[in-house]
């Protein structure tokens, strides 16, 4: 009898665990898409004071750049966009959630959000080390995120130091130097370690004025601090630079 009740108790606890933390993929998509609706409709007005604090703590984070980042995330987490992103993959629900360390960059506002999204949508537990350059907006977004999940979901954690800790997997973004540091301290975990990156643009001279305006945005958005900001141009011989200057300086 004792063994029977022990077995029933174990099954019940397992059920509670799965109910609490391992929602279905579609459940997670539905909740995450609600975040996008809130970000687009209410975030900028509801949290303008926090946005101003972020601009003071990091002068590179202007209200304009923060607004652009928030609206970009709201587009990213629309239900149709999430489904289009995930549809090419065969995704199985995890038998147990893994602890995934995310070491976030802070070069542009909320740059670590996509890593956070990737971990959550797969049903795993993010363990976040914030960048000192983006330690106002990201916790704010995460708290809003948690409010959308069931009240018993509390699987997002923050840490200040990775030394002496173990993780199932690691996602880091940093410099070539910091990559060596992370490789050493996270040597036993599965990992994605991003180093310095630069983006280039190759023009052949047939670009429309609209495309050139788009290129200007790719160069100057976020003051060029993003790894996807174009920092090098390849132009054909004899290219009329005034075509670029008209878009760059207007």
Give each language-model segment a name.
Residues 17-18, 149-233, 237-239:
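Conserved NAD(P)+-binding/catalytic subdomain of aldehyde/semialdehyde dehydrogenases
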Residues 29-31, 35, 240-250:
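Internal helical hairpin/lid segments
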Residues 84, 190-192, 250:
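Short secondary-structure junctions
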Residues 5-101:
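N-terminal Rossmann-like NAD(P)+-binding subdomain of aldehyde/semialdehyde dehydrogenases
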Residues 85-148:
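Conserved small-residue-rich beta-alpha loop and adjacent elements
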Residues 52-59, 223-232, 249-250:
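Flexible, acidic loop-helix segments that line cofactor/substrate-binding pockets
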Residues 138-141, 182, 244:
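Hydrophobic packing residues within well-ordered alpha-helices of enzyme cores
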């Amino acid at each position: 009898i004792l063994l029977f009740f022990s077995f029933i108790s174990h099954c019940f606890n397992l059920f509670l665990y799965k109910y609490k933390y391992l929602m279905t993929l579609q459940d997670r998509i539905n909740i995450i898409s609600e975040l996008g609706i809130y970000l687009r409709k209410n975030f900028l007005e509801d949290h303008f004071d926090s946005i101003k604090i972020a601009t003071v703590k990091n002068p590179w984070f202007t209200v304009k750049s923060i607004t652009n980042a928030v609206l970009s995330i709201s587009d990213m987490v629309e239900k149709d966009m999430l489904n289009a992103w995930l549809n090419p993959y065969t995704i199985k629900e995890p038998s147990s959630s893994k602890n995934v360390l995310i070491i976030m960059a802070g070069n542009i506002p909320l740059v670590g959000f996509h890593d956070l999204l990737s971990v959550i949508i797969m049903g795993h537990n993010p363990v976040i080390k914030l960048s000192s350059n983006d330690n106002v907006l990201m916790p704010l977004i995460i708290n809003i995120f948690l409010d959308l999940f069931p009240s018993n979901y509390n699987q997002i954690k923050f840490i200040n130091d990775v030394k002496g800790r173990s993780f199932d997997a690691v996602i880091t973004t940093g410099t070539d130097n910091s990559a060596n540091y992370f490789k050493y301290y996270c040597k036993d975990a599965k990992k994605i370690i991003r180093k310095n990156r630069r983006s280039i643009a190759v023009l052949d001279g047939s670009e429309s004025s609209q495309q050139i305006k788009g290129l200007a945005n790719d160069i100057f958005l976020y003051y060029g601090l993003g790894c996807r900001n174009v920092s090098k141009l390849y132009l054909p011989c004899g290219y009329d630079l005034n075509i670029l200057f008209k878009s760059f300086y207007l």
